[in-house]
């Protein structure tokens, strides 16, 4: 049993970033379970550059089905099947996304086999996570680990979720994944969690919270709460904005944080 929960940003980049890997976090819980939050197309390379082998990964949690969050799943599935002898890891998926993840995204490259058509559970141990359209829904994974999912608005008619990570009964971190600016969700996250990792686009307008919106929000909250916010999912021009985020900080790709 480890003393602390650890989080490392595998990638911090926006969907179109060429300097940074797709936004993704590697979390090690105190029981040693290694969880990857989202697996975009460049994330397997990001894990490799961290020196973290796929053999050490225990599970992947998916927050929504955009390619910069699921595009690397096919590589992981095929690597586990053909290189690691059919090893299965957990695939933790919000319940409404289980069917579309396979039917609309993954089956085009993964359903083919010499003997029969394959399904998602031929590659992963699929674990469905509870969701709620009116608030939070918690799923206990084992005696140590639980996840709370929060419905977010990212793109119209697309299901997307933020996730709260709980280790040994303690709320550890709120991870927005992708969402437009949501003052009420931020209020809740800052009240309930010691750390908040929030997506941040560096221009106003679009399908993510903008830096201007987040700065406007933080002007009205205590500095202690501002210090809890790490910004992620940013563009390649992030250097232009260093020192212009108030008390908030840009999450650094590859840096380990003790939660």
Swiss-Prot record:
GO terms for biological process: symbiont-mediated suppression of host innate immune response. This is Anti-Pycsar protein Apyc1. The lineage of its organism: Viruses, Duplodnaviria, Heunggongvirae, Uroviricota, Caudoviricetes. Homodimer. Keywords: Host-virus interaction, Hydrolase, Inhibition of host innate immune response by virus, Metal-binding, Viral immunoevasion, Zinc. It catalyses: 3',5'-cyclic CMP + H2O = CMP + H(+); 3',5'-cyclic UMP + H2O = UMP + H(+). Zn(2+) 1 binds at residues 68-69, 178, 233. Counteracts the host Pycsar antiviral defense system. Phosphodiesterase that enables metal-dependent hydrolysis of host cyclic nucleotide Pycsar defense signals such as cCMP and cUMP. One of its GO terms (molecular function) is 3'-tRNA processing endoribonuclease activity.
């Amino acid at each position: 049993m480890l003393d602390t929960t650890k989080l490392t940003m595998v990638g911090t980049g926006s969907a179109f970033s060429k300097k940074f890997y797709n936004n993704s976090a590697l979390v090690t819980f105190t029981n040693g379970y290694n969880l990857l939050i989202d697996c975009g197309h460049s994330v397997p390379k990001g894990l490799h550059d961290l020196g973290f082998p796929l053999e050490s990964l225990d599970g992947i949690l998916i927050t929504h089905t955009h390619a910069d969050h699921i595009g690397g799943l096919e590589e992981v599935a095929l690597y586990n099947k053909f290189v690691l002898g059919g090893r299965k890891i957990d695939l933790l998926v919000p319940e409404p996304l289980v069917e579309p993840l396979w039917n609309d995204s993954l089956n085009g490259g993964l359903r083919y086999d010499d003997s029969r058509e394959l399904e998602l559970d031929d590659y992963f141990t699929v674990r469905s996570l509870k969701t709620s359209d009116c608030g939070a829904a918690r799923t206990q994974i084992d005696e140590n680990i639980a996840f709370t999912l929060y419905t977010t608005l990212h793109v119209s008619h697309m299901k997307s979720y933020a996730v709260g990570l709980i280790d040994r009964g303690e709320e550890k971190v709120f991870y927005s994944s992708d969402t437009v600016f949501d003052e009420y969700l931020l209020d809740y996250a800052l009240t309930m969690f010691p750390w908040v990792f929030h997506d941040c686009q560096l221009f106003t307008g679009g399908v993510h919270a903008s830096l201007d919106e987040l700065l406007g929000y933080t002007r009205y909250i205590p500095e202690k709460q501002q210090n809890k916010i790490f910004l992620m999912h940013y563009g390649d021009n992030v250097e232009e904005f260093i020192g212009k985020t108030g008390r908030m900080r840009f999450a650094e790709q590859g840096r380990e944080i003790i939660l």
